[in-house]
Amino acid sequence: MSDAPPQPENEQECMCTQDKVLQFLNKMADESGIKDLTDPALAEFLSDSDALKEIRDLFHYPKAGTLPDADPSLVDPESDSIYLCGNSLGLMPKATGEVMKDHLDKWAKMGVFGHMSGEVPWAHCDEYCLEGVGRLVGAKKEEVSVCNSLTVNIHVLLTSFYKPTETRHKILLESKAFPSDHYAIESQIRLKGRTVQDSMVCLEPREGEETLRTEDILDYIEKNGDEIAIVFFSGIQYYTGQLFDMRAITEAGHRKGCFVGFDLAHAFANVPLHLHWWDVDFACWCSYKYGCTGAGSIGGLFVHERFLNDQRERMLGWWSHKMSSRFVMDNVLDLDEGAAGYRISNPPIHTVAAMLGSLKVFDQVSLENLRSRSCYLTGYLEYLVKTLFGENSEQRTTKLSISIITPEEFHQRGCQLSLKFSSPIDIIYPELVKRGCAVDKRYPNVIRVAPVHLYNNYVDIRRFISVLQEVAHIVESE
């Protein structure tokens, strides 16, 4: 059994506030001699002064001219793009190409012998990721597996943990969960002989509010937990960017006898996680957003160590069988322990190679340091949006106004801010793209913007704001 991950030092992981960000900006403005906090020159100074600025050099950062819809008459093709879309797809680490090439060369030279030979034998390749992935989710090696894709892992885990009874059969999730989660839960309920109408509970925010209050989630579990089989929330809500209090939700669910699991698609490699210490029952994630492993790359799952030798029914395959006797092939299952027993098939080396390449970056910088950097990046973005586009701001120079639906409290958000526009985004979004911006649209009027702590900087954010000001005037004219 491996050692437990470090215990979190405090209950509220992020202690940053908007006041601290403002103090930081004013301090840096004084040092630079720049009085206006919205001055693009301050962004240059902030980026040059950033202790983690060289992490960006570990990534391939796209030029504006390589983006398919950028207009060369509006943006210099040789300039860096404004890539603020890592919440959808992270950028490629330079190490990834090298790792992939090594395994392609190995395939060419060894063929089938690559399964058991070489520096990273393919039959064991996922195991080489476990320590690094365990650090990112706050888990022991035995509690994590690198396998499948996110939705497949939702099915794998719910098949095993969702055992409805006549009195306890409901699954609680947030309203407007990501569609794949919603469909997976619907199908699991039907497969277990229940109806979605009776067994699926989607918790809505209060009227007039965009995000769920933690106290409302906990109150619902306390009042209705005896009927709930599983509480299954996102770690970070994909649309609003809200970071849920996973520790508090887990404690509330356990007090009422519920299993508690999380979809960490937008939390993995974004914010520090402590799944082991939070006592979470199970969780799963994709790795291609903040994990930077490439489109559709391999996912992962977590099962708490208390289920290490648990024999609950599950979806099985030959990779569920212990490696020590797997190739005896006598068709007598020798179930692997912990999360390894939830694997089904052999890992695809090319997507595992992408994970290995990404983990080389996280070997050089801690997620805790990245989290601190993230708070100041999003705080700077928030300041600029509120100052230059806030509905009641005296410095707003356009009729277009923008509000932020992501929570203001830093401990309730990660890298992403979801911007809500006073005008439909049908014109706004294409004009941003023409000018070399990569952001993410959600109709009718939300654009998700994610300054990723690994490779974005203050200049990227200020350039985005400048483009947004330009586009706002186009919207006014049309």
From Swiss-Prot:
Gene3D superfamilies: Aspartate Aminotransferase, domain 1, Type I PLP-dependent aspartate aminotransferase-like (Major domain). Catalyzes the cleavage of L-kynurenine (L-Kyn) and L-3-hydroxykynurenine (L-3OHKyn) into anthranilic acid (AA) and 3-hydroxyanthranilic acid (3-OHAA), respectively. The modification N6-(pyridoxal phosphate)lysine is found at K289. Homodimer. It catalyses: L-kynurenine + H2O = anthranilate + L-alanine + H(+); 3-hydroxy-L-kynurenine + H2O = 3-hydroxyanthranilate + L-alanine + H(+). It is an enzyme of class 3 (hydrolase). One of its GO terms (cellular component) is cytoplasm. One of its GO terms (biological process) is L-kynurenine catabolic process. Its cofactor is pyridoxal 5'-phosphate. Its main location: cytoplasm. Belongs to the kynureninase family. It comes from the Eukaryota. Pathway: Amino-acid degradation; L-kynurenine degradation; L-alanine and anthranilate from L-kynurenine: step 1/1; Cofactor biosynthesis; NAD(+) biosynthesis; quinolinate from L-kynurenine: step 2/3. This is Kynureninase. It comes from Caenorhabditis elegans. Its EC number is 3.7.1.3. The gene is kynu-1. Keywords: Cytoplasm, Hydrolase, Pyridine nucleotide biosynthesis, Pyridoxal phosphate. It is found in: Cytoplasm. The lineage of its organism: Eukaryota, Metazoa, Ecdysozoa, Nematoda, Chromadorea. Pyridoxal 5'-phosphate binds at L150, T151, F178, P179, S180, D181, S234, D263, H266, Y288, W318, N346. The keyword Cell division does not apply. Pfam families: KYNU_C (PF22580). SUPFAM superfamilies: PLP-dependent transferases. HAMAP family: Kynureninase (MF_01970). One of its GO terms (molecular function) is pyridoxal phosphate binding.
